[in-house]
């Protein structure tokens, strides 16, 4: 089955809101073994919506439309669908009664715009919406299926899960299973180079790399008659990849890097304190996202100025004068100073130049030092991080967590 997703709404075209519906639907359709061949967005314009319907009908078996089911005049998803299928719009009494109950309970008037939400192309299957006032519907003709869903995700997602999935299940020939591996500390090009033969040599399962701000992701997807068969196809490929990439693979599934680090700290009963400069609390924020971290997380400081580094962390003024605030030496002193101040086993520090200004030839924007005090030893790592200020700060937190993760593996 060839599937297509169409989002309707001028606000999407204008970039006022992000089309998270398409991402959700594409991912969930793949879980059913239904591949999305096309995605598109059109504004609230009858002619362009009609063109999108015509194109989808010509090339896809399934079209899922989101948006345009509201009470205003520019909500015309159903109206254009009725014209496309040459069907009359008819009132669905049950939907109208539900709508009346909804408005009566809130002491709100039911206007003509709301009433039009209870009209559907004749012969359509109605999809109830207990989370809003816009029911969806399903129209089938000529072996094709059009499914019209509301735009708000809190309405669309339950409607999809409760009504669309049961309809699509019979079309599922094979089970699709995906295993996601998370990789950090290695560039995408280098990673692909290490496993290129594995990627190129696979048909079932397939291996697809994705680059994200918090690291790289490898998705291994297999198709089988049942879940056990699909998982059996994935296992040897996953093992081969993990053997090649080693410690660069930090986890799988929904686990985050901060969760991995937090679990290692708790498992090894190592307390930690963090001193941040350029990241301004982002590093501590990521680590404290994990529930239970309070058993090992002692405290954190944002020592942005030189004075704060000297006063709060006991960094030597001479160190800053000789080497600068952004240096290996300062990062090390920040780490040990933080550990001693908090009486923690581990001190982790970050100092850098996030930009856009402040860089020099010797110390460019993106220069970062990560300091680590662990087991009585001081270490530091130098990085040059490219990108704008926000990207430099985000990636620095990732590199710092990864640096700590790798050292904890040796404890």
UniProtKB/Swiss-Prot annotation:
SMART domains attached to this UniProt entry: MoCF_biosynth
SUPFAM superfamilies: CinA-like, Molybdenum cofactor biosynthesis proteins
Top-level taxon of origin: Bacteria
Family: Belongs to the CinA family.
Protein name (record): Putative competence-damage inducible protein
Organism the protein comes from: Alkaliphilus metalliredigens (strain QYMF)
